[in-house]
């Protein structure tokens, strides 16, 4: 609905703009004296025919705002530039194209020029997609006991309902980005969330174990797309400096979803009044609310698609087919871009040491993080005798840690802004990407500390408050590492940033899905103490990563062809 209104408003504004800048905008009398703009338009018409300019300026027709339409009408359209077709696309036969762009740096059509309120309202709504799909990924893990009883399978087998969702999430991330870069953000949100709702409902109605697994996998496959797209929406509306605080908002919402869900799902599983399948109905209700909010209130944010709309409107208004947006001249097919989207992340992972190490760091973080979905039953349920619902409530500690990390964002933002201003005053173009690693350096030591702390204080003789407080430190560490890693890869790889992030997304969700399955026998056979000690030792090996790259990252980048 909001996109439709945006489209109609664009047409109205264009009609007014063309009338304002047209040759007869001042009056209805066609015999009025031509303005300077009209003379420039006439010059352009002569230049296209090889005739010298009337005003003697000798300007190229490809750098002036005047446009001569096919019917001979002369108009000036803001934001449109003349370009030779051969410079852009070999398959276009016409001599000259009118390339449609934004009217200028302050054009309100450009989402980066929206008001602060409109930007944050948009981000707030689309950001809930990250929370939603995170919620959907984990909530089934809280009713494993009820699911195994209903379908007559083992605890490990029923954990596949969560694991397959995460596996599908990883595989889907490889192909998600090109779709929103072809049709726009909103169609992807609405279509994929609608399909997610269908498969979530099917999972809730699944008559047997196989059907449940199949529907959960398909739900994860389509659920990854809005998760991937909302990061693109953020980039559409915020400039790089503002992303310093906008990106943590996205991260916080994405992390809260998977670990708020157990706080609700565990009580659903424990309840004697409602079915355990209400975990799916809660997800379905939330998905319907989010999809409805996007449909009603979120405008399209992808700039190239907005310019495509503008070009289409100009073709309809003027009757001239030469108005084109650059996205319409893209010669690479969707299939080709999907193939590149699938292959380039692996190419970067196996050939780029930065991508490989930070991806492995996130893999370690995620195997611990999602291993807790099933591991908390061993830590709090079997050690302290907590009920199923109370075990779910213990995830509040991790969520508090996420929020503490989020509370540090203003400090990180203003510190970065001050260093950036100093760098510019000293004649530098900006800060090196390594300046993004401060958050990770704050959080990295707390990852092994929190795991050892939790592992060796989880005894019935020691208060449950000790491992619960350790989980707060763990949540703080995870959030800081994640935010810094993503911002560092974005700043380092620039053109290839999307592929670098997809690489990290794919491997960490595959690892997370595997850990959901493995954690049950691991905690059962090794026990809580040695399981967390093992994970703590692995995290110790990765702790130096942000410090090493902060000191030597610039040297590695100088030797690397894919980084600036």
Curated annotation (Swiss-Prot):
It is found in: Cell membrane. The chain crosses the membrane at residues 120-140, 159-179, 187-207, 217-237, 249-269, 278-298, 353-373, 389-409, 437-457, 462-482, 500-520, 530-550. Induction: Expression is controlled by the kojic acid gene cluster transcription factor kojR. Expression is also positively regulated by the secondary metabolism general regulator laeA. Finally, nitrogen deficiency also positively regulates expression. Expression is also regulated by the kojic acid related proteins kap1 and kap6. Keywords: Cell membrane, Glycoprotein, Membrane, Transmembrane, Transmembrane helix, Transport. SUPFAM superfamilies: MFS general substrate transporter. It comes from the Eukaryota. Kojic acid can be used for several biotechnological applications, including use as an antibiotic, as an additive to prevent browning of food materials, and as an antioxidant. Kojic acid is also interesting as an inhibitor of tyrosinase. Finally, kojic acid has also been shown to have strong nematicidal activity. It is a multi-pass membrane protein. One of its GO terms (molecular function) is transmembrane transporter activity. MFS-type transporter; part of the gene cluster that mediates the biosynthesis of 5-hydroxy-2-hydroxymethyl-1,4-pyrone, also know as kojic acid, a by-product in the fermentation process of malting rice that acts as a chelation agent. Involved in the secretion of kojic acid. Improves the antioxidant capacity via the accumulation of kojic acid that is also a strong oxidant. This is MFS-type transporter kojT. It comes from Aspergillus oryzae (strain ATCC 42149 / RIB 40).
